[in-house]
């Protein structure tokens, strides 16, 4: 039996552009080339970190309750 978790469908454009800005700022500070593929990798990594935090919080809530 698997646990089905409802996922809210929300507009991520604002958060995605914020992540793109953060990755662009990171590249500028580190003096790295602005290669789109590498920048997308940083945005993907940051999104994964955010998703991981949300899943961890959910699992903690399930375990405690």
Swiss-Prot record:
Annotated compartments? Plastid, Chloroplast
Q: Which GO terms describe its cellular component?
A: chloroplast
Keyword line: Chloroplast, Plastid
The answer on whether this UniProt entry bears the keyword Chloroplast reads: yes
List the protein's name. Answer: Uncharacterized 7.4 kDa protein in ndhF-psbD intergenic region
Q: Which organism is it from?
A: Mesostigma viride
């Amino acid at each position: 039996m698997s646990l089905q978790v409802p996922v809210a469908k929300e507009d991520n454009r604002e958060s995605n552009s914020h992540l793109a800005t953060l990755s662009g700022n990171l590249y500028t500070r580190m003096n790295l080339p602005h290669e789109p593929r590498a920048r997308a990798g940083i945005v993907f990594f940051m999104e994964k970190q955010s998703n991981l935090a949300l899943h961890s919080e959910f699992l903690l809530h399930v375990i405690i309750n």
